[in-house]
Structures are given as structure tokens and as C-alpha cells.
């Protein structure tokens, strides 16, 4: 697919970013299992290393198989380019490390995945980068948190595990008025199927590709997508590294050389070069296989999740249901506005009782797997209080939307009647009714 003529998601997931090799005519994307690439001559190698010419040098920076994956995700999300990473946490780390340095800060929603919260709250302060967490969804609280050292606003498209959908357009407006980018973790957006944050003002999108993009629980990976819309030159006071001469490349000026692709270029030629958190071609091929059925799976995931949510709402063993498609959800209006192809593939419930009751229900499941992943074709459940958010303090867990009685469920594509039956038998064992 040399030129992106077709724009529909279901077509892009199969064709974007790849044209059959002219020699082999392989219809499937080959796995280029190579560490490095030959140069035409020494002058060619010098041009590549000096970024005067773009091309393959070393697979830590770029690889033909990984390149197809990157182009495909960029097309699905509506970005100009993408960079793949070894995991979602790596994608997040490299993004923030590119935007901020010691003395800077990030403003972030407190409604975050536990691993993300820890990275922002514990790891980055070791490098001198602090995070100001906004516990409410109020726009004025985001404004109040921003200062001269703020380098980005960070939110999740649907927070994990309480599925808060932020006011993207409102937050993006605030970010841009202050000369900073909006970064959105769109992992729960399923590769752009449920929502494309860039269409609503996001400047940078990150994913754990391990989840719905891969879709089968086989492969760890991440990806960063650049919208190409943020004007780094206009805001050079906050981001001098984007416009001033780079000591890494003999005074090269990124904005002058790469324009709208400045950010994603720095991710590739500095962060992947120096940190090394790259995606292997084998992992890229597995993720590409997953992408080919992403739209089909996401549609079924959303249908099953809605039916399961309605079952839980009528269950005497469930105190509450958190699902963004429910009118009782605090951000239902925003979910209805932004999620145009279904309300996602996850929900959380509060079971009658305390933490021990939640663990008992999860332990009693037979079909639904008890594990820490989400976004698998198979249904998964976990007790976040004692697992994914266990490293947080009690106050931090509550601020993240995690309670003792919560069970987080990633709804698979099995027949929904069997998923319901599994919870029913577990409830009977746990409660005797």
C-alpha cells in the first residue's frame, strides 16, 4: 500500500504501511531478523549517521518489520509517524523523558494505571522530574497545576480501572494555551478503534501494544504516535532541545531539519539510541498479526462488555458497576461524546463485602483467567487492591479509583452467556446464592 488511498479503519488495519517486496512479492510482512544493515559505501554510512539521509542503520533505531508496524499504528491513530518500543511503560517513559528534564514537571490526572502512577510518582522524581496529580476532572484544576516548568499534560483515554473519560477538547485547549502538548495513553482505546485522541486535540498518543493491538496475550510492546501538530518552534522557550543545535548530531537543529516530525525523530534518534527500549522484529510481526483482526475483536469486545454490565447491574451480589457506557458513570456524557464505536472492553464491579470477598470471587472463576493483563481475546479478571495497585498507599489507591471490593474485568470475545455463567457459579460459591 504505497499511498494511503483508503481511510477506513478496517482497511488500514490490513494494508497500511506495507507494499509487497518487489523481489519476493510476499503478501505477508517479512520478519527482518537482523541487527544491522550494509551501507552502499562509507559516504552513504556517514550520511545516515549524520541524519542527512534517512535509512536503516541498526535495529535498535529502526527495522523494516517494525517500520510497517509503526506506519500502521500511525495510520490507525491519525498521526504522521510512530516509534515502537519494547513495552507500554517504555513508550510512556521515553515520551516524558523527551519532553522534560531535571527541574521540570508533568501535570497528570490521578486516574491512572498503577504502573503509570508509580513511574510518574516514584521513578521520575529520581531524575528530577515531578508530577502534579489532578484528582478531579475539573478544567480549572488543570489550569491551577500548570507553571513555567510544566512540560506536558498526561491523561488516559479511559482510565484503568475506573474508566474516567476526560474532556479531551477542554484539556487540549488548556495545554495549548500554555504552550505544552497533551499526551494521551490510548491503550483502552484499542489502537484508535474506540477513540482517536488526536482528532480531539491530543498531540502525542502512547499505547501498550500488548493489549488490544496485539490482542492475544502473547507479546509485550509499546508505541508512540506523533500527531505532527504541536509547534515546537513557537514554544522553544519550554522546549529548547527541539530547536537549538543538538550536541548529539554536530549542531543539527531538529525543527529546522524535520519540522512537524521533530518530536518523533528525537524519540528515535536519541531515546531509542540511548535508552535502547526498542521492539524486536519478531514482536512486531506478532503485533501486526493482531492488528489485522483488531476491528472485529474490538466490536465483539464492546458488545460483550455491554451485556455483561447489564447482567451485573441486576445481580444481588454486586454493589455497583463501573462501565463508561452506563448513565450512572461520572463521565458518561464525555464517553458518549468521544467514544463513537462502543464503550470499550472493560468494566469493574464492586462485590458485596470487603477485599477478601473480591479475592474469593476472582479465585472461584473457571473460564475467566485471574491475571494482570488486559486486552486479551480471552476474558480476564483481577482484584486491583491487592495486585496491580498494591504498591500504592491506601490514599493513592482510592485517588486512582481503586477500592477494596473492586474486581476489574477485561471482557473477551467468548460467547457472552458463558462469561456470565462463570461469574454466576463463582458468586454461588462465594455467597451461597
Swiss-Prot record:
It is an enzyme of class 2 (transferase). One of its GO terms (cellular component) is cytoplasm. InterPro entries: Cys/Met-Metab_PyrdxlP-dep_enz (IPR000277), Cys_met_metab_PP (IPR054542), OAc-hSer/O-AcSer_sulfhydrylase (IPR006235), PyrdxlP-dep_Trfase (IPR015424), PyrdxlP-dep_Trfase_major (IPR015421), PyrdxlP-dep_Trfase_small (IPR015422). It holds the Pfam family Cys_Met_Meta_PP. GO terms for biological process: cysteine biosynthetic process from serine; L-homocysteine biosynthetic process; transsulfuration. The keyword Transferase applies. GO terms for molecular function: cysteine synthase activity; O-acetylhomoserine aminocarboxypropyltransferase activity; pyridoxal phosphate binding. The keyword Transferase applies. CDD domains: CGS_like. Its EC number is 2.5.1.-. Keywords: Pyridoxal phosphate, Transferase. Its cofactor is pyridoxal 5'-phosphate. Induction: Expression is positively regulated by the secondary metabolism regulator LAE1. The modification N6-(pyridoxal phosphate)lysine is found at residue 211. Fusaric acid is phytotoxic to plants such as cotton and banana. It has been shown to induce programmed cell death in plants. In addition to a mild toxicity to animals, fusaric acid exhibits acanthamoebicidal, antioomycete, and antimycobacterial activities. Pathway: Mycotoxin biosynthesis. Belongs to the trans-sulfuration enzymes family. Sulfhydrylase; part of the gene cluster that mediates the biosynthesis of fusaric acid, a mycotoxin with low to moderate toxicity to animals and humans, but with high phytotoxic properties. L-aspartate is suggested as fusaric acid amino acid precursor that is activated and further processed to O-acetyl-L-homoserine by cluster enzymes aspartate kinase FUB3 and homoserine O-acetyltransferase FUB5, as well as enzymes of the primary metabolism. PANTHER family: HOMOCYSTEINE/CYSTEINE SYNTHASE, HOMOCYSTEINE_CYSTEINE SYNTHASE. This is Sulfhydrylase FUB7. It comes from Gibberella moniliformis (strain M3125 / FGSC 7600) (Maize ear and stalk rot fungus). The lineage of its organism: Eukaryota, Fungi, Dikarya, Ascomycota, Pezizomycotina.
Amino acid at each position: 500500500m504505497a499511498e494511503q488511498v483508503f481511510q477506513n479503519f478496517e482497511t488500514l488495519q490490513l494494508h497500511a504501511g506495507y507494499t509487497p517486496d518487489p523481489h519476493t512479492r510476499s503478501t505477508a510482512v517479512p520478519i527482518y531478523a537482523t541487527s544491522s544493515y550494509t551501507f552502499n559505501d562509507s559516504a552513504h554510512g556517514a550520511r545516515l549517521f549524520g541524519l542527512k539521509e534517512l535509512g536503516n542503520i541498526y535495529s535498535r533505531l529502526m527495522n523494516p518489520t517494525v517500520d510497517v508496524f509503526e506506519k500502521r499504528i500511525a495510520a490507525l491513530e491519525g498521526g504522521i509517524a510512530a516509534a515502537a518500543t519494547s513495552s507500554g511503560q517504555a513508550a510512556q517513559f521515553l515520551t516524558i523523558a523527551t519532553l522534560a528534564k531535571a527541574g521540570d514537571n508533568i501535570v497528570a490526572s490521578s486516574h491512572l494505571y498503577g504502573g503509570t502512577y508509580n513511574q510518574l510518582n516514584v521513578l521520575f522524581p529520581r531524575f528530577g522530574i515531578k508530577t502534579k496529580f489532578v484528582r478531579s476532572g475539573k478544567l480549572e484544576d488543570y489550569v491551577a497545576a500548570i507553571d513555567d516548568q510544566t512540560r506536558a499534560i498526561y491523561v488516559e483515554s479511559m482510565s484503568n480501572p475506573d474508566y474516567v473519560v476526560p474532556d479531551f477538547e477542554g484539556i487540549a485547549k488548556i495545554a495549548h494555551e500554555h504552550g505544552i502538548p497533551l499526551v494521551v495513553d490510548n491503550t483502552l482505546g484499542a489502537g484508535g478503534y474506540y477513540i482517536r485522541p488526536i482528532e480531539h486535540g491530543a498531540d502525542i498518543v502512547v499505547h501498550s501494544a500488548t493489549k488490544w493491538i496485539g490482542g492475544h496475550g502473547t507479546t509485550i510492546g509499546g508505541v508512540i504516535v506523533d500527531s505532527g501538530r504541536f509547534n515546537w518552534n513557537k514554544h522553544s522557550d519550554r522546549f529548547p532541545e527541539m530547536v537549538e543545535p543538538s550536541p548529539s548530531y554536530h549542531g543539527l537543529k531538529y525543527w529546522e531539519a524535520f519540522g512537524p516530525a521533530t518530536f518523533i525523530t528525537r524519540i528515535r534518534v536519541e531515546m531509542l539510541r540511548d535508552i535502547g527500549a526498542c521492539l524486536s522484529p519478531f514482536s512486531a510481526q506478532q503485533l501486526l498479526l493482531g492488528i489485522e483482526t483488531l476491528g472485529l475483536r474490538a466490536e465483539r469486545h464492546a458488545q460483550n462488555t455491554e451485556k455483561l454490565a447489564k447482567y451485573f447491574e441486576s445481580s444481588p451480589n454486586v454493589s455497583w458497576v463501573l462501565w463508561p457506557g452506563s448513565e450512572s458513570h461520572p463521565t458518561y456524557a464525555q464517553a458518549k461524546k468521544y467514544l463513537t464505536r462502543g464503550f470499550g472492553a472493560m468494566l469493574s464491579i464492586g462485590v458485596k463485602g470487603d477485599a477478601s470477598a473480591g479475592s474469593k470471587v476472582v479465585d472461584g472463576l473457571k473460564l475467566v483467567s485471574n491475571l494482570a493483563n488486559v486486552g486479551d481475546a480471552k476474558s480476564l479478571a483481577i482484584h486491583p487492591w491487592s495486585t496491580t495497585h498494591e504498591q500504592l498507599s491506601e490514599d493513592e489507591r482510592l485517588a486512582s479509583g481503586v477500592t477494596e471490593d473492586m474486581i476489574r474485568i477485561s471482557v473477551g470475545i467468548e460467547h457472552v452467556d458463558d462469561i456470565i455463567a462463570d461469574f454466576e457459579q463463582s458468586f454461588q460459591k462465594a455467597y451461597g446464592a
